């Protein structure tokens, strides 16, 4: 996305805006809010104390100057004689006394001083204690939020770090961008974790508050009514029940249906019920299901995981909705070749429904918007239908005989069932899946009698020794190996460490001679995005980074709720889906071809091309080789291993 102007999603992507007049906080409330946020940081506390000392010093100097400027209260100078009385006067002054004429007055003065010190110390201690308790309360994040147009995140999970990074990119051109995080963790914990795991947030200001996300009284402190959008994170420990309770608490505090609520949900029925009960205000993201689908499809389509992450992040081309009157009366097939710097992927109909990769003969009617991938919304410029390209010769898709495939899955979690359900839809008849899982992490009973369509599933409980892997890997000539993390059985860091160890062991077996293990395509799931660079060292073919994938979806929908049905269609088991196909199915190898010609060929196959993946560009400094939305006029020479990224049917 271009950094030259504020972020936009095109002409009315979300329909006519509903304008509400937020209650403006008073000047006193703003000053208290700024003081609360600054005093919560130890460095700012020292700064405030220094400022107060300077102010008091200036006041004292002014008072002294005024007093000495008044002759009727200033004594004339007298000669100083050194004697006991002079000594006593100086000594007593140290205790705030002096000037007593008799010893009786002096003794009484010292007794008075002692009482004053005792009482003053008690009062001072009480005041210091009260101030300390006030600072502790501020540090605990109990003060209210007065920010407007902020993104409100309720709850806490590992997805919060990549979400913040994506929101920072999305709002890089937004003045005073704010994210408020409200969870049951302490303020110190949240700020320390964010500082350690989500650095370089640019101009994005993150405000943290502590409280119960399911308690309406606590939520009143978050200024929900003036939030731009709300994100409800699914804690792995509490699950959907906590998300439902949080949504109910939000509705109790703020019945305004104009603020979209993006939630993480595991159960599809729960998600559908929430969306229906709130008339579409709640948008559900079934993170685990989408991660499982991408993992399954990545095992079938090399490079798909990289394409998905490239499409979803804010640092590059994005999806926009644009009204193009010149296309009214023309077909979707015409629209695909009508934009030089944008890739059309679907239509937003006048009734609000979306159609991703509709039939090529679909007629564009008044009020219909184009859904396109572009660098920015001002790049979605109609350049006319390319009739010369549209009539180009069609390269027939190579028809491949369906041959039974054999997959090895190492590791297991509840997500494994969704992966196999997805694989069962397109694996040829007679295909097999062998599951190898460590018995200390997975109950063998959980793997018994698994049935997924016509796939033959077997399993083995192992100890994790490399001999177990050798035994499993040499059993058959596997077409794919999928490594799943032991999510929920152990911590994320332990699960990722186990996954990376398995990847290293498998690559060692691939390189060794005489062990009966043939080199095989390796797809792995990493739970923590911080481990992705380490995981790539293991030479994995495709890496599915779970928390990044989920976070990207949540951040995208939070910034633009109109994208929700588009992503739902792309990642649903039915309908259009992302595919990475051999480029030889669309153009001859070794001959220069323009991207417009590839788009035309894909169009004639009922697909919408959005980019390509160069085999020569993968692996170098973490590069994925993915090129999304190249100019239609750009040309390159395809080689073996290159792929075309299209949206079509399985």
For the regions a protein language model found, what residue spans apply to each?
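Cytosolic regulatory regions of ion transport systems
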Residues: 1-650
């Amino acid at each position: 996305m271009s950094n030259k102007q504020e972020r936009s999603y095109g002409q009315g992507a979300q329909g006519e805006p509903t304008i509400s007049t937020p209650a403006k906080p008073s000047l006193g409330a703003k000053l208290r809010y700024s003081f609360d946020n600054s005093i919560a940081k130890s460095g700012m506390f020292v700064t405030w104390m220094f400022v107060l000392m300077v102010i008091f010093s200036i006041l004292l100097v002014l008072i002294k100057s005024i007093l000495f400027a008044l002759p009727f209260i200033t004594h004339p100078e007298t000669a100083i004689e050194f004697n006991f009385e002079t000594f006593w006067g100086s000594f007593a002054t140290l205790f705030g006394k002096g000037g007593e004429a008799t010893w009786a007055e002096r003794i009484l003065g010292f007794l008075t001083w002692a009482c004053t010190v005792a009482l003053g110390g008690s009062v001072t201690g009480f005041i210091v204690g009260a101030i300390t308790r006030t600072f502790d309360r501020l540090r605990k994040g109990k003060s209210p939020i007065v920010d407007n147009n902020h993104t409100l995140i309720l709850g806490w999970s590992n997805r919060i770090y990549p979400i913040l990074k994506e929101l920072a990119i999305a709002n890089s051109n937004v003045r005073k961008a704010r994210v408020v995080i409200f969870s049951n963790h302490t303020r110190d914990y949240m700020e320390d974790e964010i500082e350690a795991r989500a650095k370089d947030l640019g101009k994005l200001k993150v405000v943290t508050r502590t409280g119960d996300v399911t308690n309406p009284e606590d939520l009143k402190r978050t200024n929900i009514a003036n939030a731009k959008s709300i994100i409800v994170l699914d804690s792995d420990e509490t699950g959907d029940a906590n998300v439902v309770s949080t949504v109910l608490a939000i509705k109790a505090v703020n019945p305004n249906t104009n603020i979209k609520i993006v939630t993480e949900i595991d159960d599809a029925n729960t998600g559908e019920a929430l969306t229906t009960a709130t008339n579409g205000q709640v948008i559900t993201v079934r993170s685990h299901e989408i991660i499982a689908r991408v993992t399954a499809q990545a095992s079938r389509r090399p490079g798909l995981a990289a394409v998905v992450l490239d499409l979803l992040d804010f640092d590059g081309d994005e999806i926009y909705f644009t009204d193009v009157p010149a296309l009214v009366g023309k077909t979707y097939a015409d629209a695909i070749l009508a934009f030089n710097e944008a890739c059309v992927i679907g239509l937003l109909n006048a009734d609000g429904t979306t159609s991703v990769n509709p039939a090529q003969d679909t007629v564009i009617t008044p009020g219909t918007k184009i859904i396109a991938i572009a660098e920015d919304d001002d790049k979605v410029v109609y350049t006319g239908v390319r009739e010369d390209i549209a009539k180009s010769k069609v390269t027939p898709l190579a028809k491949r005989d369906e041959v039974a495939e054999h997959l090895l899955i190492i590791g297991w979690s509840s997500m494994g069932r969704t992966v196999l359900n997805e694989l069962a839809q397109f694996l040829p008849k007679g295909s097999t899946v062998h599951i190898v899982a460590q018995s200390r992490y997975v109950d063998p009973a959980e793997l018994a009698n698994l049935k997924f369509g016509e796939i033959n599933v077997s399993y083995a409980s192992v100890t994790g020794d490399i001999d177990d892997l050798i035994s499993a890997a040499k059993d058959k000539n596997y077409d794919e190996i999928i490594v799943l993390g032991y999510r929920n059985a152990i911590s994320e860091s332990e699960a990722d460490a186990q996954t990376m160890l398995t990847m290293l062991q498998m690559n060692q077996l691939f390189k060794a001679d005489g062990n009966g293990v043939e080199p095989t395509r390796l797809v792995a799931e990493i739970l923590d995005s911080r481990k992705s660079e380490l995981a790539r060292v293991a030479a994995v073919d495709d890496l599915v980074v779970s928390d990044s994938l989920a976070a990207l979806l949540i951040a995208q929908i939070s910034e633009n709720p109109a994208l929700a049905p588009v992503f739902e269609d792309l990642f649903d088991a039915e309908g259009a889906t992302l595919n990475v196909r051999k480029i030889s199915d669309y153009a001859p190898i070794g001959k220069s071809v323009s991207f417009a010609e590839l788009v035309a060929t894909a169009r004639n196959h009922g697909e919408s091309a959005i980019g390509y993946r160069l085999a020569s560009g993968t692996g170098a400094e973490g590069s994925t080789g993915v090129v999304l939305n190249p100019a239609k006029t750009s040309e390159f020479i395809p080689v073996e291993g290159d792929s075309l990224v299209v949206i079509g049917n399985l």
